[in-house]
Regions:
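Core segments of transmembrane alpha-helices
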Residues: 43-57, 106-112
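N-terminal signal-anchor/start-transfer transmembrane helix
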Residues: 7-24
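Short alpha-helical packing/oligomerization segments
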Residues: 49-81
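Membrane-helix boundary connector in multi-pass membrane proteins
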Residues: 64-68, 83-100, 120-121
Length: 121
């Protein structure tokens, strides 16, 4: 059950990252927002490669004490990530204000929170 919760959370994050390309999320990132959109898009995509490789390696590694700690860290990140997006939206950036974008972000956070509870208890 715990693995399924984590897989849904991470899959929701991956879907959000696809949506983030459409929303030009690189404009929110300190270094990339200084680049022209075409270059920033390429960097945004390329910089996600090691993150996705790490997530897939984590999943492929199977259960262990170390992977559970890392999963917990990913869970915390997803919860904080949702809060950051809410904070950005509250400041007036409406890029992720669509109900679908918000749903993806909060779906990841919700399943991460449930999974984190599963890990802790």
């Amino acid at each position: 059950m715990g693995d399924l919760l984590f897989f849904i959370a991470v899959s929701s994050l991956l879907m959000h990252e696809m949506d983030a390309i459409d929303k030009r999320e690189w404009r929110l990132l300190f270094v990339l927002r200084k680049l022209p959109d075409e270059g920033a898009l390429r960097w945004f995509i390329v910089l996600h490669l090691p993150l996705f490789v790490a997530l897939l390696a984590l999943v492929a590694a199977g259960p262990s004490a170390t992977t559970r700690w890392i999963e917990g860290g990913v869970d915390v990140f997803l919860i904080v990530h949702a809060g950051l997006h809410e904070s950005i939206s509250a400041r007036g950036d409406r890029a992720f204000a669509t109900s679908f974008s918000r749903w993806l972000i909060w779906l990841a956070a919700a399943f991460a929170a449930i999974h984190l509870g599963y890990l802790v208890f």
